[in-house]
């Protein structure tokens, strides 16, 4: 170490300090700024990428929430449509049953009316035939007692009117 101190030159030392400071100034002016700019740009790029990733993650979560909401709404709408369709089907079935019952009752009433009409017509025909037969029988039996046919018809109708047929 003593040898180094003996070889020490103040002029060389000052020259080395001036060169070192000059080198630092040159590096600061030409290299340091581009290096810091590149580091800052890289840092900003990383921050932007992280923000973009966070925004994308948030957007993805929002989209998933929207998809779930839309899916839930679609399910509710489907359930409501199925419920409405079932109600319409049941109403149509009930209406058809009611209409069929009404038509059945109407047909039964028409059939009863037709039967009653036929029955009355048959009864009238039967009464007419019975009265004609009765007249013929009475005419034969009572030919001597009643000479007038009108009186004979009145008597038979009176007797048939007294007899009620079911």
Curated annotation (Swiss-Prot):
UniProt subcellular location: Cell inner membrane
Recorded GO MF terms: proton-transporting ATP synthase activity, rotational mechanism; proton-transporting ATPase activity, rotational mechanism
Segments traversing the membrane: 7-27
GO annotation, cellular component aspect: plasma membrane; proton-transporting ATP synthase complex
Pfam hit, one: ATP-synt_B
UniProt cross-references to SUPFAM superfamilies, sorted A to Z: F1F0 ATP synthase subunit B, membrane domain (SSF81573)
CDD domains in the record: ATP-synt_Fo_b
Source taxon at top rank: Bacteria
Record has Transferase as a keyword: no
Topology term for the membrane: Single-pass membrane protein
Principal location listed in the UniProt entry: membrane
UniProt key word Ion transport: yes
UniProt keyword terms in alphabetical order: ATP synthesis, Cell inner membrane, Cell membrane, CF(0), Hydrogen ion transport, Ion transport, Membrane, Transmembrane, Transmembrane helix, Transport
HAMAP family (alphabetical): ATP_synth_b_bprime
Task performed by this protein: F(1)F(0) ATP synthase produces ATP from ADP in the presence of a proton or sodium gradient. F-type ATPases consist of two structural domains, F(1) containing the extramembraneous catalytic core and F(0) containing the membrane proton channel, linked together by a central stalk and a peripheral stalk. During catalysis, ATP synthesis in the catalytic domain of F(1) is coupled via a rotary mechanism of the central stalk subunits to proton translocation. Component of the F(0) channel, it forms part of the peripheral stalk, linking F(1) to F(0).
Assembly information from the UniProt record: F-type ATPases have 2 components, F(1) - the catalytic core - and F(0) - the membrane proton channel. F(1) has five subunits: alpha(3), beta(3), gamma(1), delta(1), epsilon(1). F(0) has three main subunits: a(1), b(2) and c(10-14). The alpha and beta chains form an alternating ring which encloses part of the gamma chain. F(1) is attached to F(0) by a central stalk formed by the gamma and epsilon chains, while a peripheral stalk is formed by the delta and b chains.
Family: Belongs to the ATPase B chain family.
Protein name in UniProt: ATP synthase subunit b
Species name: Flavobacterium psychrophilum (strain ATCC 49511 / DSM 21280 / CIP 103535 / JIP02/86)
Gene symbol of the encoding locus: atpF
